[in-house]
UniProtKB/Swiss-Prot annotation:
Region: Disordered, residue numbers: 1-20
GO-annotated biological processes: translation
Protein name in UniProt: Large ribosomal subunit protein bL32
Native source species: Mycobacterium avium (strain 104)
Family: Belongs to the bacterial ribosomal protein bL32 family.
Tagged with keyword Glycosyltransferase: no
GO cellular component terms attached to this protein's record: large ribosomal subunit
InterPro entries membership: Ribosomal_bL32 (IPR002677), Ribosomal_zn-bd (IPR011332)
Residue ranges the record marks as coiled coil: none
NCBIfam families given in the database record: rpmF_bact
Source organism, top-level taxon: Bacteria
Residues that span the membrane, as ranges: none
Iron in keyword set: no
Length: 57
């Protein structure tokens, strides 16, 4: 693992952290029990197997 050679200032640390931005998850259409829903891609299998409640939104 990389170890910093010198201490980084608080301002530099915070400005570096500010570069990271969360991305919006893309929703994919899925048909469950004749109804069309939009879910994140990682939840497609769970939605098809009826493991998650899609009507709670």
């Amino acid at each position: 693992m990389a170890v910093p050679k010198r201490r980084m200032s608080r301002a530099n640390t915070r400005s570096r952290r500010a570069q990271w931005k969360a991305e919006k998850t893309e929703l994919v259409g899925v048909t469950v029990a004749g109804q069309r829903h939009k879910v994140p891609r990682r939840l497609l299998k769970a939605a098809r197997l009826d493991l998650i409640d899609l009507d709670r939104r």
